[in-house]
Amino acid sequence: MRPGTAVVLALAWLVAFNLRSGFIGLGPALPALTVDLGLSFAQAGFLVAVPTLMMGLMAVPGGALVDRWGPARVITAGLALVAVGGGLRAIAPEFVLLLALTFLFGAGIGVSQPSLPRLMRSRFPLRLGVTTGVYASGLVTGSIIAASLTGPILDRIGEPAAWRLPLLLWGMLAGIALIIWTVVMRPWCAEPAAVGSRVPQKQTMVAGWTPWRDRQAWISASLFAAQGIVYYLLVAWLPAIYGEAGSSATATAALFAVFNAATLPAILLFPIWSDRLRRRRPPALAAATLFLLGVLGLLMLPLADPWRWLWPALAGSGVSGVFAMSLVLPADIAPPGRTGAAAGMVLAIGYAASALGPVIAGVVRDVTGSFDATLLLLPAIGGLMIALSALAPERSPTQVGD
């Protein structure tokens, strides 16, 4: 007996949560880790960069694997890598082993992510927006909880080696998720990948189709890349931007919290709205417009009361809404049996571009001596997101399952 709708959605949320918690949880632990192992800042930077790199590099092979073996099996393998690689980081005695385990951990994330769009299309082909919003909220929740709890855990222990405990905790949670996933999804793992599709097996692989030659796939990938650039740029530098504008440390923390808090409702609401409309373009356009308004306010009136609280809320909800809509699109554009390939291509290009956001902003800050040029870059990319949203695939979510 295959698991029901609520169970599959709960499991997808749990998987998504564990694809982010161990990744984001490293950031607050990095200063203690650097001191304890005697690392250079460059070495510490590699530990943060590798998971993002692997999310991009492993997305394409992950998409191919899920189209071949099905989402249940690939997620099982990916979660195993996340649990083992992520958890064993906690006992690594030196940098080389820690880096190798981080590669393993990142590979698990990269392989698993294309499986989630395929899972949603195979089980919920008429409700892709709602179901994508559910698992995407798991990504955001995992990030928020890991970022919020890791610091207090370190403070509570108060020792140089305290960084090991939160990494072990996130690894153990991934292991628990793996056990739950394997037990509940075992009947599905035993089926051929195409079982459950609403089309015959011979129709599930469309000969000659590849996302790399598909215009809609490139538009979707470009939209995902644009939102990724500005999101990771703001996550890295928004506190510094506020500080340079004259904000106090307390106010800056509160404004940054508003930005992060605004992402969670948006990541659910925009995909749900798209299902109700049976269209993707209007919600994507609305989200991109909210982001543009937010960064224009940040550029012109960053600390003016009461508007300063509105700008990060608009920017956070807007970029999160575009992120969620970008995750829906691969399942819309791909022919039956090729959702994994489409998702892999979109994620690979998107995460490769996302890694450039913080770097570009840092280089511009070094060259110009201020964040003014970076603030001009944000609305430019916001305008690009609006243009790409206007071109986004406008396909009613009525396609067959995968």
Predicted regions and their residues:
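A late C-terminal transmembrane helix in Major Facilitator Superfamily
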Residues: 331-371, 378
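C-terminal transmembrane helical hairpin of 12-TM major facilitator-type secondary transporters
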Residues: 280-329
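Helix-to-loop junctions at the C-terminal end of transmembrane segments
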Residues: 58-70, 266-279
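Cytoplasmic helix-loop-helix junction between adjacent transmembrane helices
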Residues: 101-138
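Helix-breaking motifs and short loop linkers at transmembrane-helix boundaries and internal kinks
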Residues: 38, 70, 91-96, 125, ...
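Conserved MFS/SLC helix-loop-helix module at the cytosolic interface between two early adjacent transmembrane helices
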Residues: 57-96
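Extracytoplasmic gate region of multi-pass secondary transporters
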Residues: 26-27, 215-267, 271
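Helix-loop-helix hairpin linking two adjacent transmembrane segments in secondary transporters
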Residues: 126-130, 134-189
